[in-house]
Every structure is written in C-alpha cells, then in structure tokens.
From Swiss-Prot:
Root EC class: hydrolase
Annotated TM spans: none
Species assigned in the record: Citrobacter koseri (strain ATCC BAA-895 / CDC 4225-83 / SGSC4696)
Alphabetical list of InterPro entries matching this protein: dGTP_triP_hydro_central_sf (IPR023293), dGTPase (IPR006261), dGTPase-like (IPR050135), dNTPase_1 (IPR020779), HD/PDEase_dom (IPR003607), HD_domain (IPR006674), PHydrolase_assoc_dom (IPR026875)
Entry keywords, A to Z: Hydrolase, Magnesium
GO biological process: dGTP catabolic process
Free-text function comment from the UniProt entry: dGTPase preferentially hydrolyzes dGTP over the other canonical NTPs.
EC number annotated for this UniProt entry: 3.1.5.1
Sequence similarity: Belongs to the dGTPase family. Type 1 subfamily.
Protein name: Deoxyguanosinetriphosphate triphosphohydrolase
Reaction it catalyzes: dGTP + H2O = 2'-deoxyguanosine + triphosphate + H(+)
Length: 504
C-alpha cells in the first residue's frame, strides 16, 4: 500500500486553465473557495429545491426537498471531517499524513461533495431512474447483445444492432447499449459537472462525488475485491476519457475511490435515515408515538444501556417531559437527531482512521457505517422502519407510479427525435427548423441550449468517415434526450407531461 500523504490526493489543479506553480496554504484554500462559489451558484444546485427527497410534488415547505436534504448532509459531512482532523491532530499524525496545511481544503471538499451528491438525480428520484432505464431497455435489448446467433438481436435501432463480420464495431454497439440502459444519478452528476455545466472544478473536488467506480457499460460480474465500490454505475462512456485523466491526477488505481468520498457517503447515510422518518411524521403517515413503537418493535432485543436506549429511548423520554415548551414532535426529532449524530459521527470518524491505509489506497470495499456494530444496526433500524411504514404507504406509492408514468411518457413524446435518420437529424441540428419535420422541429426547439451544445460538441469530435460514427452519433443523441429529461425538476416534468399530452 502507498504511504499516506494527502498532498498526493488533494489535487488543486483543474482540467482547464489550471493554476500554475507552487502555492501557499492560503492560495490553495482560495482555489477551493473558488470551487465552493462555482458549486453553490450553479443552476444544478438551485434545481434541487424542486426535486423529490421522499414525497414528490410536495407543497408542505416543512417537508424536505433534495436541496434541504443536501444542506443537512453538508453539515454532517463537515462534522465528520472536523472530527477526523481533530483525532489525527491528537494522535500527532496531521503532519505525517501531509494534512497540516490542508485541513481547510479537506473540510471544503467534503462539504461540497455532500452538497453536490444528488445533483444528477432525475425527477421523481429512483422511479425516474427506473423509468429511463426500462424505456431504453425495451428498445435496445442490451441482453441480446450477448446472444448468439446475432440474428436473434431484437434491438430496434439499426445503428446499434449487431452485424456479422463487424466484431470491433459490435463491441462498441454492446458498450453503447449497456451504457444507455444504465442511467444513474451519480453518473449523471459527473456528467453534469464536467460535460454539461463545464464547472471546471479541481480534480480533488470531482473525485469527492465519484461514489461508485463501475463504468455504466460494464458487463458481467464485478471483482469481489471491489464489489461494494462497483455496486452501481459511476460514470458513462461519454465521460470515460475524463475519468481516466481524473484517476491519473488523483493517483487512483482502476475501480478505486477517492478517500474523502467515504465521508460524504457516511454523512448521507446518517442524514437521510432520520430525515425520512421526520418527514413521514410531518406528512401524518404516523405519529411520533407510533414511530417510537415501530422502532422499539423492530430493534427486537432490549438491554439496559444499549445503543437503542441511549439514542431512541432517551429521545422519547426527554420529548415526553416537554421541558422546552415545544411540541412533542419537535422535541423528539431534535433529541433523536442530536443523539444519533453524537454516536454515529465519532464512530464514522474512527472507522475512517482505523481503515485509513485501505481508504487512502481507494480499495476499502465497505461503507464506513456498514459493519456488524450496533451503530450500523441503528442505521439499519431507521432504514427498515422507513421501508416498511413510509415508502410502502399508498400515497407515496401512488406518487411514485405517477412519476414513473410522467418520465416514460416524456421519453415517448421525444421519441421522434430518436427515430430520425442520421442525415435528417444532422440537418435539423444545423437549421434548428426543417419544414418537412414539423413535429421534430418543435420538439428540438424545446431542448435546452446547454444540452444541444453538449451534443454538437461531442459529435464534432467524431470523424464522419469512421465506421463507428453512426453508432456514436446515436449514442450522443440518446444522451441529449436523457440529459434534458433528467435535468427537469419534478414540477416541470409533471407540467410538461400534462401540457404535451393535452390533459390541461
């Protein structure tokens, strides 16, 4: 394993117009302050205020959106980062680990990774993801790309269909089909930051949001050594060259993760588990008293001095005393949150330090809060109660099904652009309106300029004479549609679907 020196990981250079020369501690901190400004002021962050956390299209402002959730994750991430640095300082390891002049950037990278961790999520969350992937699977049949004979291939797109005697081209077609059928919020976040928004963040800051290290076009089993890290797609074929460069800049082995990403992940796990339960009480899905009984029953074994007693029972008893003249709900969640943080944050920090050689190396194949401890059990308790009593609630399920239908319907509406021939679509891109394609012209006009420019730039880098040109052009055209629809807020997607389906 490599010697632990965070100066080799906290890389303050950028992909474009990077600062040159040796920098002082203050100058490096200013570079990361610039990252903070770029992130906080980006439209992608603002759009989170109208994207779902648990309850789609929620009008109650007290219920969390992706933005308020991300701000809470940011605060917990900062807390964990400070706890880690404080413990390393006590152990007199800051200088040995190259962190004595990088504590500010360390905290900032964690905070901004937390704030950005959901920016790639489509409308209606996981149901939006499922709708996109199901829609493309029904047309591209990625599983058929492995079939023999090739005549069994049911792919509906000529440019992506496998052909005899074209093995190198077929390999590209397989990759493209697999990639397009594995839309994922984390991978879309990388695409947003680099390709669509062109934020030109430091290498270290982008490393912080590369949560999963599996390429979206991956086929077959993942290696056991990286099974957790490769649990989901982390980036698309379109960003593969950028990720390759990122790995070099951050000294990451293939399929390995940037060290500070584990902190962001732990902060997210801690935040959403309590928040989902609080939102459910706000929505009157159950009362605080009912929630306490759900938690009590699900914990199972009750022993004096257990973590459940210290965290949940303590919050329940204090909320019933009503010593602060606040509602029982407010008091219960205040104490539950404080108790949970006070137990889980130090534990996550210690897990980070105890496993630092593997974490620094990028190969620690677990989450910080995923082990056999009672701390991990407490998080699982919150998650299981939410799954059983919140996510399965009829109101929540109905909204999720509506969200799935909205995203599927929007893809159906924009399908004429994907049915156009390469020559016809190229003409439409150049002229923006083509008289013999009235529907397609109007649909194309609705696409955002940012997404259209990303398509044009990607295709302009291809050689029209190359045999793979039709395949890759179609790939970027599909990305254009996925980018546009996944970038919508819940409310915009809902309204757009109703308008275009003429139901208003």
């Amino acid at each position: 394993m490599a010697q632990i020196d965070f100066r080799n990981k906290i890389n303050w250079h950028r992909r474009y117009r990077s600062p040159q020369g040796v920098k002082t501690e203050h100058e490096i901190l200013r570079i990361f302050e610039s990252d903070r400004g770029r992130i906080i002021n980006s439209p992608a962050i603002r759009r989170l205020q109208q994207k779902t956390q648990v309850f789609p299209l929620e009008r109650n402002a007290a219920v969390r959106t992706r933005l308020t959730h991300s701000m809470e994750v940011q605060q917990v991430g900062r807390y964990i980062a400070k706890e880690i640095l404080s413990r390393l300082k006590e152990l007199k390891l800051l200088e040995q680990y190259g962190l004595d002049e990088l504590t500010g950037p360390f905290e900032s990278i964690v905070e901004m990774s937390c704030l950005m961790h959901d920016i790639g999520n489509p409308p209606f969350g996981h149901f939006g993801e499922a709708a996109i992937n199901d829609w493309f699977r029904q047309r591209l049949h990625p599983a058929d790309a492995e079939s023999q004979p090739l005549s069994d291939d049911r792919c509906a797109v000529a440019a992506l269909r496998l052909r005899e005697g074209e093995e190198s081209l077929n390999d590209i077609r397989r990759k493209v089909r697999q990639d397009l059928c594995h839309f994922e919020g984390n991978a879309q976040g990388i695409r947003l930051v680099h390709t669509l928004m062109r934020m030109n963040l430091t290498w270290a800051q982008v490393g912080g949001i590369l949560k999963y290290t599996r390429p979206a076009w991956w086929r077959g089993e993942t290696p056991a050594t990286h099974r957790y890290l490769m649990k989901k797609p982390g980036y698309y074929l379109s960003e593969a060259p950028y990720i390759e460069r990122l790995r070099k800049e951050l000294a990451l082995a293939p399929y390995s993760r940037f060290p500070l990403t584990w902190i962001m992940e732990a902060a997210d796990d801690i935040s959403y588990c309590v928040a989902d339960l609080e939102d459910a009480v706000e929505k009157r899905i159950f009362s605080v008293e009912q929630l306490y009984h759900h938690l009590y029953e699900a914990w199972g074994h009750h022993e004096k001095g257990s973590l459940f007693t210290q965290v949940v029972e303590n919050a329940w008893e204090k909320s019933r005393s009503n010593s602060l003249s606040r509602s029982t709900e407010d008091q219960f969640f205040m104490y539950l949150r404080v108790n949970t943080l006070n137990k889980l944050v130090p534990y996550a920090a210690q897990r980070f330090i105890d496993n630092l050689p593997q974490i620094f190396d990028g190969s620690f194949n677990h989450a910080l809060l995923e082990d056999a401890s009672s701390f991990s059990q407490l998080l699982e308790l919150y998650k299981n109660v939410a799954i059983k009593h919140v996510f399965s609630h009829p109101d929540v399920e109905q909204l999720e099904l509506q969200g799935y239908r909205v995203i599927s319907g929007l893809l159906e509406i924009y399908q004429p652009l994907l049915r156009m021939s390469l020559v016809d679509f190229r003409e439409l891109v150049e002229k923006e309106r083509v008289k013999r394609f009235p529907i397609e012209s109007r649909l194309f006009q609705k696409l955002s300029t940012r997404h259209r420019l990303a398509y044009v730039e990607a295709v302009s880098k291809l050689s029209p004479e190359a045999p793979e040109y039709p395949t890759l052009e179609y790939y970027y055209r599909c990305r254009l549609i996925q980018d546009y629809i996944s970038g919508m807020t819940d409310l915009y997607a809902w309204d757009e679907y109703r308008r275009l389906m003429a139901v208003e």
